Amino acid sequence: MSFNTLINWNSCSPEQQRALLTRPAISASDSITRTVSDILDNVKTRGDDALREYSAKFDKTEVTALRVTPEEIAAAGARLSDELKQAMAAAVKNIETFHSAQTLPPVDVETQPGVRCQQVTRPVASVGLYIPGGSAPLFSTVLMLATPARIAGCQNVVLCSPPPIADEILYAAQLCGVQEIFNVGGAQAIAALAFGSESVPKVDKIFGPGNAFVTEAKRQVSQRLDGAAIDMPAGPSEVLVIADSGATPDFVASDLLSQAEHGPDSQVILLTPDADIARKVAEAVERQLAELPRADTARQALSASRLIVTKDLAQCVAISNQYGPEHLIIQTRNARDLVDAITSAGSVFLGDWSPESAGDYASGTNHVLPTYGYTATCSSLGLADFQKRMTVQELSKAGFSALASTIETLAAAERLTAHKNAVTLRVNALKEQA
């Protein structure tokens, strides 16, 4: 189906509607699964030697020192323009402001007299950040991951990226306070972070995007008792735009293409009650495509994308909630009026002047978002992902005495005698003290 084809939602059967919202299939092939499993086992067993061998094999780079030196980091910064450094600093300031505001106050309540319950927050002690390499290094992801890690107070922050690591990534890491950076990429980097090696320290939780091998490696280590936790399930990038008759077609087209150029498996969807706007957006997409260096990639993504005409904006919102996009852009008049009705989205962008690029780089929100429908149960990355919560309770004698019979009754009903005895023994001790 061509992206220029307008689809009337209400003319489609329920089966056709479900098909329109079906994402491009992602599944690790058996060969990827086996290859990744072998890499994990090899790195766990052979450590640094395996990491160097994989760098030579996959990255075509001979790596002697896995850890990047302070001198190399300083030299990388010296090669960057002041303009880029200032832009990074401005982005970090906004990211820091937004994520610092997410700090939760401690919970400290008396549930009944003499029964004090608290919830306290602690940082995840050690985190690993994976940053993909390639022709377009995602240094902005360093800012998005390392900044909340620093605010959360994570003691050890370790970054891995395929060699040779781009200057932008090294400088961004230094800017955000990352001290340990390693020339390791791919599934082998995930293995090193999960299990540790002679050079790379083992971490408690791994963050960051990657290709199919990295994604599969993260999945596998998260399911191993000796592995590590991960940030969230990963999938192709996606955007859904809701537009009304007042939307600017060129703006809508640019937002759709900003996702389509990510990869051939990306998906973009336009929902609008105005068929004329849909046609104008399709024309604007074609015009802008002609000027994009990554036009071929974007065209492949558009083949699985949709222009859907609806009855009204309320139906647009209902369809969007059913789809649960990673990015939701609302280019309508009074866009904020629709926010309360949105139930599933990774990040929402309101109005003509809130392009998705703002959230990707510098508005302050995090660009690491749930995709592939995981917005139904997962949240956008935030400070809480670098923290853990624990509860504390303290009962006074009076508080314990008042609650004792309740605990004994419940424990007896569950036939957990030792639980009941732990209370009964104390009740008897209090009676003896009286």
UniProtKB/Swiss-Prot annotation:
One Pfam family here: Histidinol_dh
Cofactor details (free text): Binds 1 zinc ion per subunit.
Leader sequence residues: none
Keyword annotations of the record: Amino-acid biosynthesis, Histidine biosynthesis, Metal-binding, NAD, Oxidoreductase, Zinc
Active site as annotated: 326 (proton acceptor), 327 (proton acceptor)
Keyword Manganese recorded: no
Record's catalysed reaction(s): L-histidinol + 2 NAD(+) + H2O = L-histidine + 2 NADH + 3 H(+)
Enzyme Commission number, as recorded: 1.1.1.23
Example GO biological process: L-histidine biosynthetic process
Subunit structure: Homodimer.
Identification of the protein by name: Histidinol dehydrogenase
Organism annotation: Salmonella choleraesuis (strain SC-B67)
Lineage of origin: Bacteria, Pseudomonadati, Pseudomonadota, Gammaproteobacteria, Enterobacterales
